[in-house]
Structures are given as structure tokens and as C-alpha cells.
């Protein structure tokens, strides 16, 4: 590098006013490769200015630049011992001689061995070349960018170091930040305000899908999703936090809506006054439907008696006529007494307001297809039929829709002789009362 700098310094030194009298004027009139043809002692003297021309030519990339540069370096080592001779007039005459024999570059190499011994003394003994060495450093920065790059790099290095520290701070905040360039783009504002992250639709779909399965993300899964979606772990963590808050807010809004608008239907069955036939049906275990299409043996009288359309079932009972005095609907023989205790459905199934109360819904008779079906949840202990299962399918049939064609209907428990009910069809006046009763009790 010292030789190169010395060589470049001579090249730049050729343009200074010190050599303007001979070197600069001489360089203007000469071709780049002409000086190598001169072989005499005069040629040694004017080789130095010729090298000054060749230094820019070497930058141009000519094919023989390496050989020429070596020749120039070796010839340059000799001439500095004769700096005063540079200003003598014998230098201008050689140009006409040097112009014709330009195509002889390989001849200079044999000549250099003679001046080479003189190479070591010149730098120490000659002041002008030293000044040339000292001067060209600022000019070399302008002409040779390869040499000035380290110095320029040193000047910029503090700023570069600072920016690297900034990027380190940012990357420490978010471990992998390639895709988040939007967050880090303002270096000065990164600490004060974080830019809003814009997620793509594909990223949002994946995040929503993951949130559907897991509201809280474990770290391995978060790292996996960060690599999958080109996001940082911090971004995914913050997105899940925001999404959980949004979900909580939505649930609160839904809870408010259901509490305000949805409690009226949930409270409707609670008060006993609003319990109609439909509510009593819902309270049953199997919710027996009303089937008028399956006619019992004496279907016509009950159809005339129960001629109300199905639309009138949900209506509350107070709209009906007041109940008649207690009627003997059926008599059950006591276990030990011969007396026939009366069973009053009005006193049992109705409260003061004429509708079924909630405690008696399970025990109230239900009309199915022209027959009474008595659920056995509460009526079993009343009639002494404690051995029957408490289901609607095992309910007692008072209307005669079963396989028994005769008027007498025995209780379904064959092992118990007590609950033998008298024929309802044999007593015609009581049958008329039975036909009227369902209007008042079973609506």
C-alpha cells in the first residue's frame, strides 16, 4: 500500500503547480502509453511524468496496466534523486521522439535494475516527494474512493453504531421483527408510540381459528404461530389479550340482553296464576300431546264435552265459568272401610284463582284422546296405588280407551284389590257431570 500511495501521490502531484511548467503541459500533449518507448537517460527523467498519466489510465482498466504500473513504480524510485532536474528545459524535447515508438511497452523492464539501488535514499533525502506524500492524502480521498472508504467509514461509524443499538433495542422488544417493519420504521418514535399493526386477512383467520379452540395460548403454540404467520410472539400475545377483552365485552352485552328481554319467558311459569293447560303439559315428564284423532269407545259424548279448540288451551282458567259444586267423579273403595270417600278434583287440582297451582301440576289429570290419564307421581299415594311406576305410560285410564271394552275399569295393579272403581258409564247422571267437568278443570 505504501508503494501504491506513493504512486498515486506522484500521479496527483503531476497536477500541482510545482510541475505545471513541464509535467502538466507535457502530459496534455502525450498519449498514455507513449513514454515507455524512450530508453535513454533522458527517458528515465521523463518517465516520471509519463507514469503520472498512466495512473489514471490504470484506473480505466487497460489490458497492460499491471506491467506499466510496475515499470512506473521502479522508474519513480530513481527520479526523486534528481528533483531539480525536473524543472530543466531538456524534458520538453523528448515528446516528439516519444510519440512515434508508442507500441513498445515491454522494453522498460530491463532498464529498472539500474535505478533500483537508488530507491531507498530518495524518500529520506528529497523533500519534494515527501511533500507529495503528505499532500496527496486529501486529494486522494477525492480521486480514489477505494482508499478513502475506511476513513469515511470511521467518520460514519458512531452514527452506524447508534443505529445498531436502536435496532437492538427494538429487536429485544420483539424477537423476530422482519415482518413488523411497520412498527420499527420510525427510529425516534419507536419508544414513545408503537405503530398500529395491520394484520392480513389470512393471519386474522388463523388467529380467530386458534382463539375458537383456545382462548389462552401456551408459549410453544405461540412460537409456532409466530413462525407460521410471520408475526412476533409479542404481537400474537397482544392480539389474544385484545380478543379476550372483546369476547368478555360481547358476553357481557349478551348477558344484559338476556337478563332484560329473556327473563320474562323464564319467569312466566313461576306464578301460579299464569299456569294454563299448556304450562301444566310442559311440567309433565313426557309432555303428553292432545290427540283427538284416536276416538275412545264413547268418543262422541266426550268430544261434545271437550269441544274446545286446541288454541284455547293456553288460556288461563279464570276466563272459564265458575266451577260447579263438588261432584262425585269416581268412588274408590277404602282398604278397610266400606264407605266410598269422595274425590273432588276441584278441591285437589284447583287453587283459589281457578288455575292449576304449581305444586299440583304433576298430579292433575290429563286428557288424552278422550280419556283421562292420571300421572302417578302424586296420585299414587292418594289412591293407595303406591306400587305403580311414576310415569305417564303407567297412568290409570278412567275413560275406557284401553282394551277393556266393558264399562268396568280395574286398576292396573292386579295384586291390589282395593282400588276398584265403579263404572262411570253406568251412572247416567254422573256421566253427564263428567262430561261437563273437563271444561272447567282441564282447560
UniProtKB/Swiss-Prot annotation:
Ranges of Low complexity composition bias in the record: 301-310
Assigned keywords, A-Z: Developmental protein, DNA-binding, Homeobox, Nucleus, Transcription, Transcription regulation
Gene3D superfamilies: Homeodomain-like
GO molecular-function term, one example from the UniProt record: DNA binding
Superkingdom of source: Eukaryota
CDD domains found in the cross-reference section: homeodomain
DNA-binding region coordinates: 192-251
Region (Disordered): 74-151, 163-197, 248-354, 401-443
An annotated GO cellular component: nucleoplasm
Biased composition, class Polar residues, residue ranges: 132-151, 166-178, 188-197, 257-267
Protein family per UniProt: Belongs to the Antp homeobox family.
Cited function: Sequence-specific transcription factor which is part of a developmental regulatory system that provides cells with specific positional identities on the anterior-posterior axis. Binds 5' to its own homeobox.
The protein's name: Homeobox protein Hox-A3
Organism (species): Mus musculus
Gene name of this polypeptide: Hoxa3
Amino acid at each position: 500500500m505504501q508503494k501504491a500511495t506513493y504512486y498515486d501521490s506522484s500521479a496527483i502531484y503531476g497536477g500541482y503547480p510545482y510541475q505545471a511548467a513541464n509535467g502538466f503541459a507535457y502530459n496534455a500533449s502525450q498519449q498514455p502509453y507513449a513514454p515507455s518507448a524512450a530508453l535513454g537517460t533522458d527517458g528515465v527523467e521523463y518517465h516520471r511524468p509519463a507514469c503520472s498519466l498512466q495512473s489514471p489510465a490504470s484506473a480505466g482498466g487497460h489490458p497492460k496496466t499491471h506491467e506499466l504500473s510496475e515499470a512506473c513504480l521502479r522508474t519513480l524510485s530513481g527520479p526523486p534523486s534528481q528533483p531539480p532536474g525536473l524543472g530543466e528545459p531538456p524534458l520538453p524535447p523528448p515528446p516528439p521522439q516519444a510519440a512515434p515508438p508508442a507500441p513498445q511497452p515491454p522494453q522498460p523492464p530491463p532498464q529498472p535494475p539500474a535505478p533500483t539501488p537508488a530507491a531507498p535514499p530518495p524518500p529520506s533525502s528529497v523533500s519534494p516527494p515527501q511533500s507529495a506524500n503528505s499532500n496527496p492524502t486529501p486529494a486522494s480521498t477525492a480521486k480514489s474512493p477505494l482508499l478513502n472508504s475506511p476513513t469515511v467509514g470511521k467518520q460514519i461509524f458512531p452514527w452506524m453504531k447508534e443505529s445498531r443499538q436502536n435496532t437492538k433495542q427494538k429487536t429485544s422488544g420483539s424477537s423476530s421483527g422482519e415482518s413488523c417493519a411497520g412498527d420499527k420504521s420510525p427510529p425516534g418514535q419507536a419508544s414513545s408510540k408503537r405503530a398500529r399493526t395491520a394484520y392480513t386477512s389470512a393471519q386474522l383467520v388463523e388467529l380467530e381459528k386458534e382463539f375458537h379452540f383456545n382462548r389462552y395460548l401456551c408459549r410453544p403454540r405461540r412460537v409456532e404461530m409466530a413462525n407460521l404467520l410471520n408475526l412476533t410472539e409479542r404481537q400474537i400475545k397482544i392480539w389474544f389479550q385484545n380478543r379476550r377483552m372483546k369476547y368478555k365485552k360481547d358476553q357481557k352485552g349478551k348477558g344484559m340482553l338476556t337478563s332484560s328481554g329473556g327473563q320474562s319467558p323464564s319467569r312466566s311459569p313461576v306464578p301460579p296464576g299464569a299456569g294454563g293447560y299448556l304450562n301444566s303439559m310442559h311440567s309433565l315428564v313426557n309432555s303428553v300431546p292432545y290427540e283427538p284423532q284416536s276416538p275412545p269407545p264413547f268418543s262422541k259424548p266426550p268430544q261434545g264435552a271437550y269441544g274446545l279448540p286446541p288454541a284455547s288451551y293456553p288460556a288461563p282458567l279464570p276466563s272459564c265459568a265458575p266451577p260447579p259444586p263438588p261432584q262425585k267423579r269416581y268412588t274408590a273403595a277404602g282398604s278397610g272401610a266400606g264407605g266410598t270417600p269422595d274425590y273432588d278434583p276441584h278441591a285437589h287440582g284447583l287453587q283459589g284463582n281457578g288455575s292449576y297451582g304449581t305444586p299440583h301440576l304433576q298430579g292433575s289429570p290429563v286428557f288424552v284422546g278422550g280419556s283421562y290419564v292420571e300421572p302417578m307421581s302424586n296420585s299414587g299415594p292418594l289412591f293407595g296405588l303406591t306400587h305403580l311406576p311414576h310415569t305417564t305410560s303407567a297412568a290409570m285410564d278412567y275413560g275406557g280407551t284401553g282394551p277393556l271394552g266393558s264399562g268396568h275399569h280395574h286398576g292396573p295393579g292386579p295384586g291390589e284389590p282395593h282400588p276398584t272403581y265403579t263404572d262411570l258409564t253406568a251412572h247416567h247422571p254422573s256421566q253427564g257431570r263428567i262430561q261437563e267437568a273437563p271444561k272447567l278443570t282441564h282447560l
